[in-house]
């Protein structure tokens, strides 16, 4: 008899785990998946082009219901199928509608939810997040009826939402508490390049903002008041200021949680029958909000569940890329540096190109690329592999090809 594997969550992490299991051990488990959205699995990364009208829901659907049926996976999808209770003693889960399913092994992939700024007016109609297909549908409906939008937060998600609403014909103001967008992903120079480009595309910015109150009229948001007394009109406000791991279900059954569900290097919780991965977890003090580490976690957990050895998850530097058509930027690692670092910088304002490499002890510590990002993967490899740059330092700014040619020359000389 097959073991019963239950996965709570059908988002990026849970679905990637399924894909990995279908490769490594397709016949080992009877698998049941619970997802609280009424679909199969869609690519959440593609919500921005969905909002902009460049893609349809069918375009971004990666695993429809037929896929689950074809692989013998039971899928319970929709709000009524959201799991509300884990009984660790009986090894079973209970959904909102009363569906009860037993497990031998359980995976929690409950993801995260948007952080909503707790200020007066945050519950007004027209205040929403940008997280799933339902959010996109609500944003499109609002764009069809209203003209002015504000996006609070100039991180990756906020800028993608802002450009999507701009493409829908809205006048969009981006509100941010720093002087540059993507201040956690870019240095000052690259941030200024990006801001200038977005201004040229029609976005407005209110930077270093102290957001105080969302002002409403007849229960509908009409604008934002700031600490300096200024006011921005907006009848649609998008909150894009971060996420909070969904840990309540794990907490309610007694699993150890801090900011996220605590897991080991094999993604195991303190209950040996229960695993967790994705945006709901905390691993060695880190929580996660980008796709790349989620996919790495899925590979490690699939290895463990399929009993092909004991792979261990390690948090690696994650590269940043902006998904706005025509804007190319990349950053990875420590791109700010300190007094012990060397800085290699190339800047061409007329071409809109900026490159900065941060070196420490003859190794790459971080990189920022704006306008020309072709070598991003190369710099990511140098960082991950902790490559000694002593032989290629004069060439590293110019990318992989010159560096490989240099190493080939040295190899020939040494033969």
Model features per residue range: what roles?
Residues 139, 389-415:
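Cysteine/selenocysteine-centered motifs that mediate thiol-based redox chemistry or coordinate metal-sulfur cofactors
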Residues 1-6, 62-150, 225-229, 238-240, ...:
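FAD-binding core/adjacent interface of flavoenzyme oxidoreductases
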Residues 138-186, 221:
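Rossmann-like NAD(P)H-binding beta-loop-alpha module
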Residues 1-4, 10, 23, 280-377, ...:
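Mid-to-C-terminal Rossmann-like scaffold of FAD/NAD(P)H-dependent oxidoreductases
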Residues 1-77, 164-185:
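Beta1-alpha1 glycine-rich phosphate/pyrophosphate-binding loop at the start
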Residues 123-145, 216-225, 230-303:
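FAD-site-proximal beta/loop scaffold in flavoenzymes
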Residues 30, 75-95, 101, 168-262:
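A Rossmann-like FAD-binding core segment of flavoenzymes
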Residues 12-15, 38, 112-114, 134, ...:
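Residue-level detector of alpha-helix initiation sites
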């Amino acid at each position: 008899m097959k073991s019963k594997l239950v996965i709570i969550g059908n988002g990026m992490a849970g679905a990637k785990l399924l894909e990995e299991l279908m490769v490594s051990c397709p016949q080992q488990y009877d698998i049941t998946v619970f997802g609280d959205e009424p679909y199969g699995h869609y690519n959440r990364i593609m919500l921005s082009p969905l909002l902009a009208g460049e893609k349809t829901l069918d375009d971004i659907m990666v695993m429809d219901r037929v896929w689950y049926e074809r692989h013998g996976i039971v899928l319970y999808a929709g709000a009524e199928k959201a799991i509300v209770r884990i009984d660790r003693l009986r090894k079973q889960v209970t959904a909102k509608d009363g569906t009860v399913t037993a497990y031998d092994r359980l995976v929690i992939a409950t993801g995260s939810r948007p952080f909503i700024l707790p200020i007066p007016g945050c519950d007004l109609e027209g205040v929403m997040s940008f997280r799933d297909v339902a959010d996109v549908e609500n944003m499109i409906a609002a764009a069809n009826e209203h003209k002015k939008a504000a996006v609070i937060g100039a991180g990756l998600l906020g800028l993608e939402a802002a450009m999507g609403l701009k493409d829908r014909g809205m006048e969009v103001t981006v509100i941010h508490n720093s002087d540059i967008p993507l201040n956690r992903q870019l240095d000052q120079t690259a941030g200024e390049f990006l801001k200038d480009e977005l201004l040229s595309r029609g976005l407005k910015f209110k930077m270093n903002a102290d957001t105080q109150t969302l002002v409403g009229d007849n229960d509908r948001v009409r604008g934002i008041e700031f600490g300096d007394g200024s006011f921005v009109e907006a009848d649609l406000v998008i909150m894009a200021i971060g996420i909070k791991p969904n840990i309540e279900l794990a907490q309610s059954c007694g699993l150890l949680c801090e900011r996220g569900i605590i897991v080991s290097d094999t993604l195991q919780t303190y209950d040996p029958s229960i695993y967790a991965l994705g945006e709901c977890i905390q691993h060695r003090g880190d929580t996660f909000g980008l796709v790349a580490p989620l996919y790495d976690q899925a590979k490690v957990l699939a290895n463990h569940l399929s009993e092909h050895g004991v792979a261990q998850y390690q948090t690696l530097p994650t590269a940043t890329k902006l998904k706005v058509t025509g804007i190319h930027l990349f950053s990875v690692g420590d791109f700010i540096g300190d007094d012990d670092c060397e800085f290699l910088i190339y800047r061409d304002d007329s071409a809109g190109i900026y490159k900065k490499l941060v070196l420490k002890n003859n190794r790459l510590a971080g990189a920022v690329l704006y306008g020309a990002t072709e070598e991003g993967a190369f710099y990511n490899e140098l960082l991950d592999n902790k490559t000694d740059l002593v032989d290629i330092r004069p060439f590293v700014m110019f990318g992989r090809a010159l560096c490989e040619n240099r190493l080939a020359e040295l190899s020939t000389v040494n033969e």
